[in-house]
């Protein structure tokens, strides 16, 4: 029966949430810019929470400034905090870009962030003269509504609105919006672009900032920044690209802005599994007007061969529950169906029409009935799994206690993974990344269902 059973959370209380607040996504996007620094216009806890979350997943420090609003700012506003904070940040760190990220407190008090920034920029020009070259981008992320994915999308749209300029000359490049993914995933997508001989503009590139080599700074005078990141000039050039490929459904506002303002075509694909990666590669080849490389076809063949070797023997007929961000859940669900596994539950903490339609397509292609949990949380998933368990779960480390209590093995992926190390370096996108994911799933099944009975492994 090819249909989805949409299950929406009916209670107001969220228990063990699948999403976090908007500023998280905005800070993540800003840190993907070369010599870019976010400054949080809010309390100290707003930045500490995000730094902690990023650190325990990537095992890397995250440079995030904060205006440190206190009780008086809730009454009188945070004008002086923001102006002084931005000026100190520019003078001490000399960033190429500062992203000013709002929070609950600054949004509710109604601070005129853009007006405060104009004052700060005027004072910096007066004090520093030509040495002041930092670009300022205001990012509205009221954290009492929506979630981190919306904050990520708002940040990208703000970068495009503020920085992109139409110079009229086509640069023959393709904009890539990767979404909130791991460094290994971005490197794998860059590898695909290289095989296709296409130069991407990655909006934004967090691969090196969140997985940088530990080496001495090359100069003692310049503040230390991690290597890599998208240069500001590339964001300015994004308006002259030949197309935009988005791996994030919440990056669509940025790609839609590029389409409306600069007439740049856009497409959305999450390259996990065979069909999804095929769609991504076809779009890339069509937009860039290039042929698919033989090396990429070989990588596809290796994935197909791995599926033929493994799927029917160990995976066919099994059931799974997938939870996390909607792009990941939708991509993994389609890949599971290709492996002969039924994604019995697809659980996300948001409601998005692209996700709903995508899951309908997955169910139709596989002729399966999938329970799609919308605006949900891990507590709701736990209750469903108690009634109808699955063979394994796929998602981040936040589901580890459910997996332990119910005796269901957990295949870790997505964000955050904090009870294992190195996962952020291992891609799960593209053909090679899908082989990694296939191996991870299969080894989990072998350990749980075959290892206790060793004779089955000899069959």
UniProtKB/Swiss-Prot annotation:
Family annotation (CDD domains): Nitrogenase_MoFe_beta_like
Protein family according to the UniProt entry: Belongs to the NifD/NifK/NifE/NifN family.
Protein name from the UniProt record: Nitrogenase molybdenum-iron protein beta chain
Cofactor(s) required for function per UniProt: [8Fe-7S] cluster
Annotated signal peptide: none
Origin organism lineage: Archaea, Methanobacteriati, Methanobacteriota, Methanomada group, Methanobacteria
Matches recorded under InterPro entries: ChlB/BchB/BchZ, Nase/OxRdtase_comp1, Nase_comp1_CS
MF terms in GO: ATP binding; iron-sulfur cluster binding; metal ion binding; nitrogenase activity
Residue numbers binding [8Fe-7S] cluster: 21, 46, 104, 143
GO BP annotation list: nitrogen fixation
Organism: Methanothermobacter thermautotrophicus (strain ATCC 29096 / DSM 1053 / JCM 10044 / NBRC 100330 / Delta H) (Methanobacterium thermoautotrophicum)
PANTHER family, sorted: LIGHT-INDEPENDENT PROTOCHLOROPHYLLIDE REDUCTASE SUBUNIT B
Transmembrane segments: none
Free-text cofactor note: Binds 1 [8Fe-7S] cluster per heterodimer.
Pfam families: Oxidored_nitro
Assembly notes: Tetramer of two alpha and two beta chains. Forms complex with the iron protein (nitrogenase component 2).
Function noted in UniProt: This molybdenum-iron protein is part of the nitrogenase complex that catalyzes the key enzymatic reactions in nitrogen fixation.
Keywords assigned by UniProt, alphabetized: ATP-binding, Iron, Iron-sulfur, Metal-binding, Nitrogen fixation, Nucleotide-binding, Oxidoreductase
